Amino acid sequence: MSDLDEAYQLDYFEEEGFHRQECVSCGDMFWSRVKRETCGEPPCAEYDFIDNPGFDESHSLTEMREAFLSFFEDRDHERIDPYPVAANRWRDDVLLTQASIYDFQPLVTSGTTPPPANPLCISQPCIRMQDIDNVGKTGRHTMAFEMMAHHAFNAREDIEDPEQYAYEGEVYWKNETVQYCDELFEEMGANLDEIVYIEDPWVGGGNAGPAIEVIYRGAELATLVFMSMEQDSDGEYEMKDGNRYSPMDTYIVDTGYGLERWTWMSQGTPTVYEAVYPDMIAFLKDNAGIELTDEEERIVHEAAKLAGRMDIDEAEDIEAERDTIAAEVGVEVEEMRDLMAPLEDIYAIADHCRTLAYMLGDGIVPSNVGTGYLARMVLRRTKRLVDGVGVDAPLDELVDMQAERLDYENRDTIRDIVRTEVEKYRETLDRGGRRVRQLADEYAEKGEPIPTSELVELYDSHGIQPDMVEEIAAEKGVAVDVPDDFYAVVAQRHGGDDTATEESQTPYEDRLEELPETDRLYYEDQQRTEFEAVVLEVFDRDEDTYDVVLDQTMFYPEGGGQPPDKGTLSTDDVSAEVTDVQQYGDVIVHTCDDDPGKGEFVRGQVDATRRQRLMQHHTATHIVIHSARQVLGEHVRQAGAQKGTDSARIDIRHYESVSREKVKEIERLANDIIQDNITVSQEWPDRNDAEERYGFDLYQGGIPAGEQIRLITVGDDVQACGGTHVARTGDIGAVKLLNTERIQDGVIRLTFAAGNAAIEATQRTEDALTEAADILDVAPDAVPETAERFFDEWKARGKEIEQLKEQLAEARASGGGDNEEVGVGDATAVVGRIDADMDELRAQANAIVEQGNIAVLGSGLDGAQFVVSVPDGVDVDAGEVVGELAGRVGGGGGGPPDFAQGGGPDADALDDALDDAPEILRTVANA
């Protein structure tokens, strides 16, 4: 096996007199200018910059960010703007941005498209959900952070086909990267003798390479990754994940400098939180009534230097580490816990509010899936922390404090979302509390602790936090198994993207790959429906179905939520109906009911009416979502869409139901755009240029591949789109919103019709209204008032009927009739048959129980039905009685001890079953 030792033998290290050494504590190899025993990273060493800043000057976040970016601009790097934290807005394989390299995966890193600049520098906001349980405890972890970075994208000069990559040659590599790092430290005034470069090979996403962790005074301030290998079962290098890797044609400098930690290093505060958001920490402490004495301040500062040991990813037992830290500081562990726990919660609240500001500010809407689930999880955990530590400020106010710092313009929407979510959480807790008590009873009976799997399910289904489960379970004497990384476990469970797509497959895929790309004529003239082409290949699918490939086509294949065109392919001898059109790679396949013949010249005719309706609905989809964003807010984004000939639907991410007034406003705005008869234009710009001009709202309908992307512009709305569209908005005619419904939490479906389909939908509604008016014998405009009057009368008569039923039940209960009274111990049971519906049976049973008697009633109205009701204080289980009775009529039933119902199909056995009732009652009572 070959390792990466040689990869770290840098000329720069040799020139600067670095020594390669092994840490006596953890065994890692590292480089430093002076001889030392350990690598300097916790737990091998403590933080050595608390009250001892590592740089010449104290910097704020803003100042540190500018210092970094300016440093690299001075070294010929181009500064680019940061991307959103919601990575699924430009890629479909991840949810959140966790590193600056996410901005360039997979298209740039694979060489498919060029980077926006090369080399470049950026300060990228990131969110790492896996760090959530460490936040507040270690003093250094933040779930939301900015990764300052510089990147260089290189391609080897000896590759066979350099034109297949979007960049070429070497910009710079390892020596220059380490030198830049050293120079940055020097410019900040760091003591270069204290800097340690730890060898730590990197693996991720099928790629790998040597990497270096940069440690200064106990803090990891940077990671320098040299992505240069790809997974290969026959590869030369075996990496720490157990897989083998080989060099790849491209090699990339991927660095990460934590903005928050650099700022912390410059200030030397006890934790990173005081350095990053001092005003909010001060506000939270004051609001929660936390005031520290001088001695308590001393303890906090001393403990902070050792807090790096509290990393749940490294420590085997967090509480044992706390015991050790308390002993070293010289206090009892309980005193340490009582002092630090509220502070840790305060730190977590500040961090989580910043995370929420990033999430909601970038348009993530809380829901039960994907990024929405993660936002909801953070919000609910934060609310629990706020309540637990005694902060009485509303959560929306706390999140807004961070949103203001981050300069988001949609702060009103952010606050509205938080308020809505807090109210939903309250309702969820009311429902979920009952489930926790039930679960506690179950495990109390088993004599087992409530396991982690149940905790995760409680959190997913009801939003119940582990500490609430512990509190309720303790009342029942039941332990709870809460792992230290509980929230990371939950987040990982929902870490996959919620927009997975299925790739089309065909049994002759290999043969399709040999065919040339189909020329797509429908992009040249979307209104044209006739064309001529040559048949390149015909595949026999079955006896009467053929898949035909042409050199060019006007038929649009299914894609982007738009169904395929239909029509005919004709020769002098054959007229084949085109029933389906699909795209496989660059080849378009037409499914036909006849074989036009390979090599034949064909005339294509697209169904013009169908094409026109689909174009109207597709362009209308763009207009409707643009209108929805104008009315509901910029957070609104497409979650799915489907176009048809009679109607279309678009699913949007929104945090509450859409009122009728809002629907009408969306509809009015959409029709204004249509009446303005705006030109619908298409262009094919470079991807980077398009993203720079319009941002990632381009990708409402999905993320296209390729260096150039097709943009459709309708007024102020610009989207990347591959569908067919009308030439001007006036060609749509009109749009009518037909329905709105919540299809899942955080997703609203808008169904609408356009063009003639809108007229037809309106006519159907008018027909229904006219028919209702005829039935009610009133004018159409009087239908709502008349329907409301009839409904009120119907409800009133229903109440009268119920009252009469109750009176009849009371009369029967007191008057005897066919009912039989039997003794059951000290109680009396009334047994009888009443051929009535279940409502009346229940009413009479209630009347009998109110008199202090057991009720056993049967009905033969619909099969055989029973109701058994038992008054308080009588030791008879109604569920057991019903079970016995129902068994005699071929059915089943049950319920709680005081009331049960059931039945079966054998109505002929009803009377015999009731005859057995007295004996059943006595047996159950004596059991």
Swiss-Prot record:
GO molecular function: alanine-tRNA ligase activity; aminoacyl-tRNA deacylase activity; ATP binding; tRNA binding; zinc ion binding
Alphabetized Pfam families for the sequence: DHHA1, tRNA-synt_2c, tRNA_SAD
Record-annotated disulphide pairs: none
Gly residues bias: start-end ranges: 888-905
Cofactor: Zn(2+)
Listed Gene3D superfamilies: 2.40.30.130, 3.10.310.40, 3.30.54.20, 6.10.250.550, Bira Bifunctional Protein, Domain 2, Threonyl-trna Synthetase, Chain A, domain 2
Protein's UniProt keywords contain tRNA-binding: yes
Gene Ontology cellular-component terms listed: cytoplasm
Top-level taxon: Archaea
Gene Ontology terms: biological process: alanyl-tRNA aminoacylation
Subcellular location as annotated: Cytoplasm
NCBIfam families per UniProt: A-tRNA_syn_arch, alaS
HAMAP family in the record: Ala_tRNA_synth_A
Family, similarity comment: Belongs to the class-II aminoacyl-tRNA synthetase family.
This protein's name: Alanine--tRNA ligase
Gene source species: Haloarcula marismortui (strain ATCC 43049 / DSM 3752 / JCM 8966 / VKM B-1809)
